[in-house]
Amino acid sequence: APQANSFYVGAKAGD
């Protein structure tokens, strides 16, 4: 997942 979107993707993909 893009680290630039880690705040958003992290909640969904855990990355």
Swiss-Prot record:
GO cellular component: cell outer membrane; pore complex
Broad class of the protein's primary localization: membrane
Keywords: Cell outer membrane, Ion transport, Membrane, Porin, Transmembrane, Transmembrane beta strand, Transport
UniProt superkingdom: Bacteria
UniProt membrane topology term: Multi-pass membrane protein
Subcellular location: Cell outer membrane
Family note: Belongs to the outer membrane OOP (TC 1.B.6) superfamily. OmpA family.
Miscellaneous comment: On a 2D-gel the determined pI of this protein is: 5.5, its MW is: 32 kDa.
Description of its domains: The extracellular loops are most variable in sequence, and in some bacteria confer sensitivity to phage and/or colicins.
Name of protein: Outer membrane protein P5
Organism: Glaesserella parasuis (Haemophilus parasuis)
